[in-house]
Amino acid sequence: MDTTAEENALRREIVKTFQIHAFELKKEAVKLCVKLFLDHDKETRKKWTNKMIELLKKQTLQSSLISEELIRDTFRQCKSKGTQDAGKLLNVFDAFSLQPYDFDADLRKMVLRKEKTSLAADSSSFSHAARQRFFIVKQRAMRCASLKNFKFTTCEILGSSTKHLQSVVVLGMLTQQKADCYHIEDLSGSVEVEFKEDTKFHHALFHEHSIAIFEGTFENSVLTVNEVAMVPVESAEVTRKELSSNENWFGGDDKIAFRCSDRLRSALAKQEDTSLVFLSDVFLDDKKVMKAVFKLLQGYKDQPPVAIVFCGNFCSRPRQTDTIDLLDRGFRWLANQLTPLRKDYEKTQFIFVPGPDDPFVDTVLPRPHLPSLLFKHISPIISCTFASNPCRIQFASQEIVVFRSDLIKKTCRHSINSITVESIPSRYARSVLSQAHLCPLPQHITPVLPDFSHSLSLHPLPDLLITADRFETFTEKVVGADTIVSNPGSFSRSNYTFHVYYPCQNRVEASQIPVSELDDHSNIKNVIIFFFLF
């Protein structure tokens, strides 16, 4: 058989095989398949074709028409096999580079948004972002086993009712249209609510724009609330099972979710002692802080982590005329500390996440990376990434979200329920995971770019959520989720606390460098004074 005849036969075979599985290949996609398979025998062609089809079936596709680009990406993923070293398993995703996936209520699946994202959003973008938040929480509530016996009522039905109704249950977003007058809103309308002194608030933080379940009595167009509860938290495994999808919504070019990749899960199992270190509020202009950082770097040089994540603020004098000069000097100082250790940390990725008061960083979320002029001191010495805030980190099959913002006290300050200081960590962790969003506060309290609200979404939930906050250090795990919520605290303000995460073991170790040890050159492992295991 001549080459042309063989190509034609292969072309017909490929088209027929994909058609059997309800896929239609574009002309360019067929040409690429022929090019990829022409030099292989029949059995190899069959094996690779079946692998690609299985991979395509696991993805949420907009159409059954398959493009050349999709074939290339699918073949690349099928061909990827074996293990990689720890450094190549790590990826950092900028908030502004993430694909905007939305939940389609009609299709009941996540779909890629067709409209381009813009920094200059209009009013429709704000309403779209709010609807998406509501859709995600609502679809979790509708499939939650513990809520199956509840009959939910919409605001529209209540608004048109003139009857006295007992035990009304509404899923809605809490809003305040005027002082001391609260409403709950859903996609159909809004209804006024009234809280009593004995209204029972379940274990969470309830504030404006919280999406929650309200139960009470409806009379005279007002819902008098008896109980308020968050929607139960749903693990990533359950989310993907319910949506029947292994598609990657986290970040990067891979089509298959990292946690669903057998190759990455196998690679993670071989990284038993690999760790990631997280520090927040690292004042590079403070000599004592830099001594503590040097102590940490020296302590880990014999067994360096795969990544060290430094979160801002990076200057003790924010928003001053000399702030940028202090920062420039601080990064130069850090570079000098790293120079003699560069061989020890040649496989470690240093990640810098800006804080709320760092220069050139807008107050609107998400925030871009630090000024590029600071890169010049660090980049020639170590492998580093200047990330956005928030940012997403993938290590093997693990998904990690890092968010630097002092929102815990702000959230507590705007909460309508009374809380104790001791309960704040668990309440906050439950609230942020139930809302499936890093910043569920209203725009006038903490503004968010509506077209990039998806970058703050926690759907499905990650393996680890780092909420780098000035609040006291804590590590929490919420019932129903596999996610660890970890706050390393303020490194500079809280006597040099930091957190260490072991992804293979799914364990967080909360550590601290005692002030008395800063003049001692012993290994950092001897100065860890406490830890929590999960």
From Swiss-Prot:
Q: Name one GO biological process term.
A: DNA-templated DNA replication
- Molecular function terms from GO: DNA binding
Does this UniProt record's set of keywords contain DNA-binding?
yes
Subcellular localization is given as: Nucleus
Query: What's any one GO cellular component for it?
Result: epsilon DNA polymerase complex
Q: What is the lineage of its organism?
A: Eukaryota, Metazoa, Ecdysozoa, Nematoda, Chromadorea
Q: Which family does it belong to?
A: Belongs to the DNA polymerase epsilon subunit B family.
Q: How does it assemble?
A: Consists of four subunits.
Keyword annotations from UniProtKB, A to Z: DNA replication, DNA-binding, Nucleus
The protein's name: Probable DNA polymerase epsilon subunit 2
Q: What else is known?
A: In eukaryotes there are five DNA polymerases: alpha, beta, gamma, delta, and epsilon which are responsible for different reactions of DNA synthesis.
Function statement: Accessory component of the DNA polymerase epsilon complex. Participates in DNA repair and in chromosomal DNA replication.
Q: Which InterPro entries match?
A: DNA_pol_a/d/e_bsu, DNA_pol_e_bsu_N, POLE2
Gene3D superfamilies assigned to the protein according to its UniProt record, in alphabetical order: 1.10.8.60, 3.60.21.50
PANTHER family (alphabetical): DNA POLYMERASE EPSILON SUBUNIT 2 (PTHR12708:SF0), DNA POLYMERASE EPSILON SUBUNIT B (PTHR12708)
